Amino acid sequence: MLTPIIRKFQYGQHTVTIETGMMARQATAAVMVSMDDTAVFVTVVGQKKAKPGQSFFPLTVNYQERTYAAGRIPGSFFRREGRPSEGETLTSRLIDRPIRPLFPDSFLNEVQVIATVVSVNPQINPDIVALIGASAALSLSGIPFNGPIGAARVGFINDQYVLNPTTDELKESRLDLVVAGTAGAVLMVESEADILSEEQMLGAVVFGHEQQQVVIENINALVAEAGKPKWDWQAEPVNEALHARVAELAEARLGDAYRITEKQERYTQVDAIKADVTEALLAQDDTLDAAEIQDILASVEKNVVRSRVLRGEPRIDGREKDMIRGLDVRTGILPRTHGSALFTRGETQALVTATLGTARDAQNIDELMGERTDSFLLHYNFPPYCVGETGMVGSPKRREIGHGRLAKRGVLAVMPSASEFPYTIRVVSEITESNGSSSMASVCGASLALMDAGVPIKAAVAGIAMGLVKEGDNFVVLSDILGDEDHLGDMDFKVAGSRDGVTALQMDIKIEGITREIMQVALNQAKGARLHILGVMEQAISTPRGDISEFAPRIYTMKINPEKIKDVIGKGGSVIRALTDETGTTIEIEDDGTIKIAATDGDKAKHAIRRIEEITAEIEVGRIYAGKVTRIVDFGAFVAIGGGKEGLVHISQIADKRVEKVTDYLQMGQDVPVKVMEVDRQGRIRLSIKEATTPDAEAPEAAAE
């Protein structure tokens, strides 16, 4: 008999239910978490033993959305879900980031978390539900895990923080922030904002962390009732004697190596020291484990770098804690792109381009929460050569997708609306060198490339990565961190924004004890760094260029009566196809009668506008037009009078005398003046040649097209 154990509680405006014991009983732990009809089934499986020779913690998180959750069948050829979407990849990373630091350092057993969305309410995003589920399942499993964690989404509407806003509420919000953490510490923040102050951003983080305590309390209560026994796992005892011997041989030499400011030269020297020490120790005692020596060397290396920072000594590359590396900013470096920039900060460099397209270049995204169209794309590429390595080149990896989304969040708040700038915009950041914070270099490069392309962004934006080294109550916040400082430090804290405020904030914290004071120091230090970078960027380009590139399509907008849309499209699209072929333009029509004409040549666009005006012009009864015979029938002739319109000249209206045979008077393609006699309710036009050729008739209005 299946007996579920259920925990139900109120979480802001929503009711959350966590249920275990019903399904996937062969997994290490499984929970079904629901929040107002959005339900995510989360399983955890942990291997009891680590693989021999395992040197890293093999945690994988897979978040997957099933279309049946929204009552739909996949639209793919095989009618089933395929490879993970960008959204699924981003949510997998969102779950991974706060749980990874909570496993013991020496725990190397394989752990897999799978979160499957099985029911979705379009108003409730499944990502927070999945995070709560992962936390609950890991806490129930008995696997060594220093959780649970809580998770919350925070909005900012009418100057008030809103807990877990609905999809509709988020449209009105100036902030979309996700925060996750334990009872005592924030571990992860991911956000985008509409240029908010540092105080408002920090307030949102603190608000979200306070509110999520109810989640942690209820998971703890569920674990007390249904939790599995804790694993009998003990960390391998540290070989103190070997640690002391390694430190004696390597510490001073590694300290000298970390005074080499050039990255590749430093890496070469560090690798040589590690190889020498390992070889010397194995020569003395061949029973030693080379992998254990390497682990101890990594620990000594970390201690060398951290202790120097905490003592207030210069950093790896000789900088003080709040110094920014040298900047080099260039725009317009690629002649045929619509906009380009090369942004260099120390040994981190991004080549960024901006391309302008039409509405049909926009990305149509079919998500579980509904379909949407994205007219601003930002893609981030991290080729192996940027760090002096060889490797696979192909489709983007999880990291590239995540960094691209962060850079996009940083720029999104300053992008013009579709009515202000009716283009689809694609920004691509090619990381050509990397030594710390390439995603923030992408934000700076994107801002520069967009201005170079003539995109009327509201303000320039820049990004900076901050780091932290903390031991006890002693802490140092580092500005513009290197890759090594990111790896060996306790926090990765990225902030993007304009002179007026923050547009994106991302935090990943590896330790507990990060207080509001520390986050405040980091945010304030980041603001100073951001303003410094913006000052240098403004020397290269301070405002968007007045015109777009000569190689970019020009988009002209006109408005017609929505009732005339059918005339412009024509039967089966015949008229609009003929128009695009004739004028060499791209024409897009919206339901409200807005027409967008894209052309690289202004004259072609003007020609298309003129033709559309002719097609949509009202036919005036009593006016004489120049027409062309298009069809001859027994009872008269059809005559085109321009703009794709055609009327009938009845046989009785061809001449003043009786006409026995139409072809005696008219031939196909013949130009004739015609007078509009009537337009009936169905839009049919009755014409007369006889009335147009009377002595007192006025001159014809226009030539037929």
UniProtKB/Swiss-Prot annotation:
Membrane spanning residue stretches: none
GO annotation (BP), single:
RNA catabolic process
What start and end residues bound the annotated signal peptide? Answer: none
- Function of the molecule: Involved in mRNA degradation. Catalyzes the phosphorolysis of single-stranded polyribonucleotides processively in the 3'- to 5'-direction.
| HAMAP family listed in its UniProt record | PNPase (MF_01595)
Q: How does it assemble?
A: Component of the RNA degradosome, which is a multiprotein complex involved in RNA processing and mRNA degradation.
Q: What is this protein called?
A: Polyribonucleotide nucleotidyltransferase
Source organism (scientific name): Yersinia pestis
